[in-house]
Amino acid sequence: MNMIQIFGTNKSFDCKAAQRFFKERRLPFQFVDLKEKEMSQGEFESVVAVLSKNLGSRTSAIEALIDPKSKDYSSVAYLDDSDKESKLFENQAKLLIQPVCRNGKTEATVGMAQKIWEGWR
């Protein structure tokens, strides 16, 4: 059985809502506070790969992960795609849309995605 991972910060209401969603359905999950421990390169790659498959391109996946409402958005808005990806990886807590949820290596979501989570076990 896959372990569901929720990446986000404790201050995020959506992260709290995601935790509540999985708790209410008695689905085991691990919450990873991005302020304490950011995604490893492998975890980040896995999320980007799944999103790339669903959205059609790696560029779209990176764009989907970046929060345009973030205070630091201007630091990535005009970068080349490859630079955007490395900047996002280096500043996950500040730039990611939260929560980023992942179910094993095959499923991942950005933001609130209850319809998709319904199918997770």
Describe the role of every protein-language-model region:
Residues 1-37:
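Local sequence-structure signature of Cys/Sec-based thiol-disulfide redox active-site neighborhoods
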